[in-house]
Amino acid sequence: MQCPHCQHHNSRVLESRSSEGGQSIRRRRECLECKHRFTTYERLELLPVTVIKQDGERQAFDRSKLLRGMVRACEKTDINFQRLEHIVEEIEANLQQQPKREIHSEAIGQMVLQYLRQESEVAYIRFASVYGRFQGIADFVDTLEQLQREQYPERQYLTMT
């Protein structure tokens, strides 16, 4: 590793530790020439994932865009930001494990819905309303009835339609 102080190419590792939740390795190094100490990080290079939007447009996967959508859906719920970041990390890891480098936005939306459903019904409905492009009250009612049937299958419900 090249020293940032004198540009010498030889250094020794003084200390290594896992960082960023196991996603990188932090190394303290010392230049063998000038004895300057510096820190480097080693990260796994993630392969790019392309998202195919509903209109056919292709975009690079943007974890911050996904996180923003989830934060908005979870406003005024008990789900904290760190939990949402963890969910996004899990979704991103899932995408990296897929053999295909392209994925439809609907598949990502379904992953988010699975997580949010376990966290908060309110967040689930909010995200589903945007992701599913709800057109009106009937779409909300259908989704609420589906949630209710799945949560309490032994009950019988009157439908509004």
Swiss-Prot record:
ZnF region ranges: unnamed: 3-34
Source domain of life: Bacteria
InterPro entries noted in UniProt: ATP-cone_dom, NrdR-like_N, RNR_NrdR-like
Domain ATP-cone stretches: 49-139
Co-factor binding comment: Binds 1 zinc ion.
Cofactors: Zn(2+)
Keywords (A to Z) from UniProt: ATP-binding, DNA-binding, Metal-binding, Nucleotide-binding, Repressor, Transcription, Transcription regulation, Zinc, Zinc-finger
Alphabetical GO biological process terms: negative regulation of DNA-templated transcription
Recorded GO MF terms: ATP binding; double-stranded DNA binding; zinc ion binding
Residue segments, region Disordered: 1-21
Amino acid composition bias (Basic residues), ranges on this chain: 1-11
Chain's role: Negatively regulates transcription of bacterial ribonucleotide reductase nrd genes and operons by binding to NrdR-boxes.
Record-stated family: Belongs to the NrdR family.
Protein's name in the database: Transcriptional repressor NrdR
